[in-house]
Amino acid sequence: MSLMFLRRAGNIKGRNIRFALQRGSVGYSQQSSEACKNFLNTTQLRTMVQTAALHGPKPMDSSHIKVTNVKELKPLPEWKSLKFGENFTDHMLIMKWNREKGWSTPEIVPFGKLCFHPASSVFHYGFECFEGMKAFRDEKGVPRLFRPIKNAERMLSTGTRISLPSFDPAELAEIIRKFVAHENRWVPDQRGYSLYIRPTFIGTDEALGVHHCDNAMLYVIASPVGPYYSSGFKAVKLCCSEESVRAWPGGTGHYKLGGNYAPSVLPQKEAAKKGYAQILWLYGDEDYITEVGTMNCFTVWINKNGEKEIITAPLDGMILPGVTRDSILEICRERLAPKGWKITEGKYSMKEVAQASKEGRLLEVFGAGTAALVSPVKAINYKGTEYEIPMPEGQEAGPITSEISKWILDIQYGKEPNNPWSVPALP
């Protein structure tokens, strides 16, 4: 599997990308300059990469991975008995970084505990980010990753925000692909089941003080998981946030930081006491819809202009750029827009959703994320009034939600084998 294939799989060529030389190593960040696109893959860039590799700190490199196999493989669990995040594969992957030396050789080692100094920066100042992605087994037995380059890009973006070291996302995606190939037997062979992959990026300086990290670690663990809904879709009720906000302008809501998740647990617990599965996070005097729980939110309605529309909040700095979100938008533009649907990334408020419900224009609402793929919503409590979302009789999801779910699942499980979003993870 070539790195160029992974780049194509993530549509990198269509993005604004810049490689920069940072302290003798190659860094990566998104820029708006059109000229940056034309710079990618040029002779000049290749020369810079080679120079950095020879004379500066070592860049992340997927070409060689050191493997130390466990002495005895664990028995595989019964797939039907799986609980999310409780079973782990035989091995994990570790890469260390030092400002002087650069990236260490990636190592696949037996799964086990990690040991850190009590003053490590990850424990005190929040130098931590993570990703969530999955591998699926197709009908021919081939394990497949879903758009791994997108997760690698997002991890770089998040890590950069908290001053963790740079890397080439294509190298990380390829390293993860090789790790999944090594743990191949842990990828379930039933539709609805998958191998959940958790890359984690942390600062490991052994000293107190808030400053950029001189040492870091990126490690990957994996856990086989069952379907989010064991017996098909299960629509949920939401409760709008009134006292808490998930993110705010100028903050870090659009980064996958661990610190964005812990503060949501207490409000979520209070909502659960009232019988609601998730919180619909709102922002501002207009009660703009941002996210639902830990997922992006989509609304399907007839808008005020009488158009059939699928709308989700824009990436304005408060919204996590979800891989599932991006995939849904792309597939809807490709397959539903030609059928008269308007696909929109734009601000819209809970006030507008409530009004649409009163006028019979509200059709469907669903959350979207890696864990559930899509999570249909059947009711939203807003300022003490519960607004019901219509459902087909005897079903737990509307037709658009169901169709989107099937389209993406078919890609994930290799039903569309030539789709660039599906990356084989063979040894």
Swiss-Prot record:
Names of the cofactor(s): pyridoxal 5'-phosphate
Indicate the residues annotated as transit peptide: 1-47
Tell me yes or no: is Nucleus among this UniProt entry's keywords.
Answer: yes
Q: CDD domains in the record, alphabetically? A: BCAT_beta_family
Show the catalytic activity: L-leucine + 2-oxoglutarate = 4-methyl-2-oxopentanoate + L-glutamate; L-isoleucine + 2-oxoglutarate = (S)-3-methyl-2-oxopentanoate + L-glutamate; L-valine + 2-oxoglutarate = 3-methyl-2-oxobutanoate + L-glutamate
What does the record give under GO molecular function? branched-chain-amino-acid transaminase activity; L-isoleucine-2-oxoglutarate transaminase activity; L-leucine-2-oxoglutarate transaminase activity; L-valine-2-oxoglutarate transaminase activity; pyridoxal phosphate binding
What does the UniProt keyword field contain? Answer: Amino-acid biosynthesis, Aminotransferase, Branched-chain amino acid biosynthesis, Cytoplasm, Mitochondrion, Nucleus, Pyridoxal phosphate, Transferase, Transit peptide
Pfam families assigned: Aminotran_4
* EC class name: transferase
Q: What GO biological process terms are annotated to this protein in UniProt? A: L-isoleucine biosynthetic process; L-leucine biosynthetic process; L-valine biosynthetic process
Residues found modified as N6-(pyridoxal phosphate)lysine: 256
Keyword Transferase assigned: yes
Where, per UniProt, does this protein localize?
A: Mitochondrion; Nucleus; Cytoplasm
This entry carries the following GO cellular component terms, namely:
mitochondrial matrix; mitochondrion; nucleus
* SUPFAM superfamilies xrefs: D-aminoacid aminotransferase-like PLP-dependent enzymes
For this protein, the Enzyme Commission number is: 2.6.1.42
- Give the primary localization class: mitochondrion
Summary of the function given for this chain in its UniProt record = Catalyzes the first reaction in the catabolism of the essential branched chain amino acids leucine, isoleucine, and valine.
**Family statement:** Belongs to the class-IV pyridoxal-phosphate-dependent aminotransferase family.
UniProt-listed NCBIfam families: ilvE_II, PRK13357.1
The name this protein carries in UniProt is: Branched-chain-amino-acid aminotransferase, mitochondrial
According to its UniProt entry, this protein's organism is Schizosaccharomyces pombe (strain 972 / ATCC 24843)
